[in-house]
Amino acid sequence: LAGQAVELPAKTSAFRDWAERLRAFAGDGGLDGELAYWQGQLQGASSDLPCLDPLGDQSNRHARSVSCGLDAEATRQLLQEAPAAYRTQVNDLLLTALARVICRWTGQVDALIQLEGHGREELFAEIDLTRTVGWFTSLFPLRLTPAEGIAASIKGIKEQLRAVPNKGIGFGALRYLGSAASQAALAGLPVPRITFNYLGQFDGSFAMEEGALFVPAGERAGDDQSPDAPLANWLALNGRIYGGELRIDWSFSGERFEIASIQRLADAYRDELLALIAHCRVAEGQGLTPSDFPLARLDQARLDQLPLAPCEVEDLYPLSPMQQGMLFHSLYQQEAGDYINQLRVDVDGLHPESFRAAWQAALDEHDVLRSGFLWQGAFETPLQVVRKRVEVPFSVLDWRGREDLAAALDELAAGEGRLGFDLSEAPLLRLVLVRTDEERYHLIYTN
C-alpha cells in the first residue's frame, strides 16, 4: 500500500513438518508421561446434561444460539481489577463462573469441559511456528471442581488450569497419534459435552479510530458449513471482547435443548460472573495459590498461613545454601553481629530528598532489596519473601555546630550496628544521613 518493496522475514517451519514431528513424538512415547493425568480427568466423570432429547439431531440445520455478556464497566473490572485479587487470568474467572453454574444446573460436583488451546506449543527446538499459517488448535478435556465458596472455587480452578501439562496439546496427540495402548486407554472414556473458548480482546485488532484496514462487517456472512454437518458439541461457548464489552455466544441444537432453557443458563452464568467480579474487588477477596510460587513448593494450607497480606507478596523461593548458613548463624548468634555490614562516608553537596528518592527507586527496581525471610511456624524450610513495595528506612539528622560531632557519629553508628535487623522484615538495610555542615553530610549505611 505504501508503494515500497515487500521484504518478508525468514520462512518458519511448515505445517507438515510440525505434523510429522508431532506424530513421531507421540508415537515414540514422548507424551506417555501425560497419560495418567488425562485418564484422571475423564475416569468416573459424568458428561450428562439436562436436555430436551439426548438423541436430538445435532446437524447444523438445527443450530440455535443465545448470548449473554457484560457492559463496558463490568468488562473493564473483569480485565483490570478482578485478576489482581487471586493473581488470575481472565480465563480463570470465566471458567470458575462456568463450572459453578454448570454444577448447579446438572446437580454434579464437577463440570466436564472441553477447552481449546492455540496449539502452537514449543515442544521442539527445531520447529518454529511463530509465522506459520495454519490451524493448530488443540482440544482437551478438563474436569473442573468448584468449591462451595467463591474464594475457594477461584483458587481451586486456577490451580487445576495451571496443572494442565503443555497447555493441553498432549491429549489429542495421545488420543489420535499415540501408541495403540494410549489410544485405547483414552478411547472409552467420557467425552465432554460442553466446549468453551475465550478468544480474547478484539478491540486492538479492529481499532477503527487508529485506521485499521479491516473491521468486522455488519452484515451476515452466511453459512460456513453444510446444514448436514454436525455441530461442534452439545453446547459450544465462544467468548470475545469487542467494543469494550464481553459477549459469550452459546450454540446448540434446537432438537436437543430448549432455547429458553439455555437462555436461563446463560443469564445465570452472567450473574455468577458478576458475583465473582464483585468478590474480587473487595479487600477480603484476595488470596495466593501454590502455582504463584512454584519454587517454594508450598501447599495451599501452608500458603494460607503466610504472616503477610497477599497483596504484599511479590515472590517466594527457597534460600541458597549460603543464605541458609547465614540465616542459621544470625538467628543463633544474634549478639555477634557477624553479618552486619556498615559503610560510612562524608558527602559534599548532597540533596537529601533526591538521595532518598534514588534509594527508593533502587528498592523498587531490585527484588533482593525488598527481601526478608520466613522460618517460623509452618515454614520449617526457610523461604525468602520478596515484598511488592517497601519504604526505604531513611532518616536525616541536623548536627551542625555540634562540638562532640566525631564521638557522637561513632556512637550513632555503633548504635545502628547493635540495633541489628528483624530478618522477617524487609528491607534489611537502614540509612542515616547526618548534616554536619552547610554543604556536608555524613552517611551511615547499615545492612
Identify the meaning behind each predicted range:
Residues 1, 109-116, 147-154, 171-172, ...:
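Extended, hydrophobic beta-loop-alpha segments that form or line the acyl/peptidyl-thioester binding
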Residues 11-35, 81-95, 99, 104-224, ...:
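His-Asp-centered acyl/peptidyl-transfer active-site segments
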Residues 70, 144-146, 250-254, 345-349, ...:
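Short beta-strand-to-loop capping motifs
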Residues 72-88, 252, 361:
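Surface-exposed, Lys/Arg-rich phosphate-binding patches that contact polyanionic backbones
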Residues 238-242, 374-376, 434-436:
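Short beta-strand micro-motifs enriched in acidic
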Residues 435-444:
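Conserved catalytic micro-motifs used in adenylation/nucleotidyl-transfer and phosphoryl/amide-
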